[in-house]
Amino acid sequence: MGQFCSGYDTSQKWQLNESGIAIMPMGATEQHGSHLPLNTDTITASYFAEYVAKELHAMLLPPMPFGTSLEHAGFRGTISLKPEVLISFIQNITDELEAQNIRFFIIMNGHGGNFA
């Protein structure tokens, strides 16, 4: 079963997790018109990541709500990372997970612009 790492102590769950898999939902904070929230991509990625984490008995990391949304620059509410910042962020997370003996890191991407 996927376990979301949030405000409660998950250290024992990490210790007991034998799958060696961590999943991080990655979305974006950007406009989607007046009919959808700014975090639509994060909501979608989180939904699928939770399902996959349960199926794989993986640890579910908190969602990354920001991505590269350069195509939406100028729309109010959009927060975009530079591609090199996103790459550095992912590398840092990968290094941290590797140090904790996580063998597989899955990014469940919910935003087409995250192509850094």
Set out the residue ranges of the language-model regions.
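Active-site and ligand/interface coordination hotspots across diverse enzymes
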Residues: 1-37
